[in-house]
């Protein structure tokens, strides 16, 4: 926790420090497992990642496809200011060292009814999307953390595209909810679009069907 975000060339004292296991993939796998879904988590951790694997397993996630590679696991350094806003710096680590052979092996485990859930934290994503599509595996993709590379991914082969307002602006080169959804419908008409709006809820759109769901206070 910091009074404000650190600036270039500045050293700033923090008032609190906490360390948590996480990453979008880990958090989503655990959430799905707790909701009663059978989850098989595939990916890579570094030599420091034994506790990450244990955390997944302790929450009912199948970790048989999690590989250990040399080096460090992925990390995020998050600054939180006094208003609760955050600023995040990511180190990809092992998340960026998945091997093509391991990817193919993981996708070969898919059975009828399975769904592939992806985020933009790992390497070889175009290959993964193409390979999963070839195997007729439905794909759910969240492009966070957003990067220019996403614009060249085969998004036309994604079944569900989940994104927030900022990511939507980058994907569509448009501002405003309606403009973002309109452009993405034109460019990726096969995708079912899910636009998350924080405290304002979420919008689902596929073709002419558009559904808005309010956020639930927690």
Kindly give the residue locations of the regions a language model identified.
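Short, glycine/polar-rich helix-capping loops at beta-to-alpha or helix-loop-helix junctions
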Residues: 146-153
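A short beta-strand/loop micro-motif in the catalytic core of glycosyltransferases
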Residues: 158-165
């Amino acid at each position: 926790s910091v009074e404000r975000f650190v600036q270039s060339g500045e050293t700033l004292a923090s008032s609190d420090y906490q360390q948590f296991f996480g990453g979008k993939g880990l958090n989503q796998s655990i959430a799905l497992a707790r909701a009663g879904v059978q989850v098989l988590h595939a990916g890579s951790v570094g030599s420091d990642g034994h506790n990450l694997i244990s955390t997944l397993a302790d929450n009912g996630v199948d970790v048989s496809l999690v590989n250990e590679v040399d080096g460090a696991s992925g990390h995020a350094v998050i600054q939180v200011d006094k208003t609760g806003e955050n600023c995040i710096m990511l180190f990809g680590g092992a998340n960026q060292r998945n091997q093509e052979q391991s990817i193919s092996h993981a996708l070969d485990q898919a059975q009828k009814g399975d769904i592939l859930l992806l985020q933009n934290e790992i390497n070889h994503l175009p290959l993964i999307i193409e390979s999963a599509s070839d195997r007729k595996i439905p794909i759910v993709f969240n492009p966070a953390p957003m990067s220019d590379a996403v614009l060249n991914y085969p998004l036309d082969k994604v079944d569900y595209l989940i994104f927030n307002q900022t990511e939507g602006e980058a994907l569509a080169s448009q501002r405003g909810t309606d403009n973002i959804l309109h452009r993405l419908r034109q460019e990726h008409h096969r995708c079912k679009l899910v636009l998350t709006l924080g405290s304002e809820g979420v919008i689902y759109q596929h073709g002419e069907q558009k559904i808005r769901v309010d956020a639930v206070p927690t």
